[in-house]
Amino acid sequence: MSIFERKYNFMSYLEWFETHANKHRVIVQKLSTQNYTKEMIIDYFLFENMVEKEPEFCLLYAKKQKCHNLQALNCYLCACPHFRFNDEGLSVEEGINYKSECSIHSKKSSYFVYEKVSHLDCSACSVPHTKAYIRKHFDVDWKKIMQKCFVTSPKA
């Protein structure tokens, strides 16, 4: 964890991933016990509904702030299945430790560097936040959809 992350009490990628998976599981289990269908579950995760009914799901909900500028932002996946991370780093280039990357190399992604640590910025990308994408990759178990995100063997 970088000094920046410690100073601002940020979670590591893996801590966030596990915490988010648990929050997601609780909501989906609740909806499943109410006999929600796949389509109803997807609709439930629309930004406006989540802000109202699940305000603890995302820190941005308190400000009614979207992480992506989309009219019909769907928060089912929150993170992207194409996001790859390792808290120790995926690679080091020119003294910069890259902790995350996009597996499809989206032209809408970019990086920001703080204290020689590079992080992927996906805020301009909409790939995982559309109903069509979510329908195609849907699973009630968020971790199954996201299983390739955590890279256990970083590149040399």
Where in the sequence are the language-model features?
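Cysteine-centered metal-binding/redox modules
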Residues: 2-156
